[in-house]
């Protein structure tokens, strides 16, 4: 019996897989299913958007009609259509779609935070008066001090008289206009 040299396996043709770039990455079946389910949820989020928001998301020619059809369908047909949309999304680069969707969600969250800040500022204006007016004038130098004082005085009277808070709403609207004109 002849003994083979120990390096005889190194001479096998086609065995040049020493590059890390050529390495095969194995993905489990469960991970593939999780990714497919996540894309189906992404498709459902897109389907739940309104027409104006849908226009802001980059969708190609055959994906958009599928989404519009899913918006019109109810019950079991909708589920099947969402499956189809998920399948279509698997064949595409979904990163631009995700970014546009995140941008839409973030814009809504920023607006909610801004409204809470304006409501707190309105309440401080009613409670503190001139100190809070100085804060508003620092934030928005073009704000009308006299109009703010009038609205604050009326809001205090309405609060004391247990009347509907018409002036408080007007203060909020005025602050919102100032914030929108700024940005």
Curated annotation (Swiss-Prot):
Q: Which Gene3D superfamilies match?
A: PSPTO4464-like domains
Recorded GO CC terms: cytosol
Quote the subcellular location field of this record. Cytoplasm
The UniProt entry lists the main location of this chain as cytoplasm
What Pfam families does the record tag this protein with? DarP
- Where, by residue number, does the polypeptide cross the bilayer? none
Disulfide bond sites = none
Q: Which UniProt keywords apply?
A: Cytoplasm, Ribosome biogenesis, RNA-binding, rRNA-binding
GO molecular function annotations of the record: ribosome binding; rRNA binding
User: Does Cytoplasm appear among the keywords?
Assistant: yes
Q: What are the GO BP annotations of this UniProt entry? A: assembly of large subunit precursor of preribosome
Coiled-coil segments:
none
Q: Report whether RNA-binding shows up as a keyword of the record.
A: yes
InterPro entries per record: DarP, DarP_sf
Family per UniProt?
A: Belongs to the DarP family.
Looking up HAMAP family in the UniProt record yields: DarP (MF_00765)
Q: Cite the NCBIfam families for this sequence.
A: PRK05255.1-1
Per its database record, what is this protein's job? Member of a network of 50S ribosomal subunit biogenesis factors which assembles along the 30S-50S interface, preventing incorrect 23S rRNA structures from forming. Promotes peptidyl transferase center (PTC) maturation.
Query: Mind telling me what this protein is named?
Result: Dual-action ribosomal maturation protein DarP
The record lists the organism as Shigella flexneri serotype 5b (strain 8401)
The record's gene field reads: darP
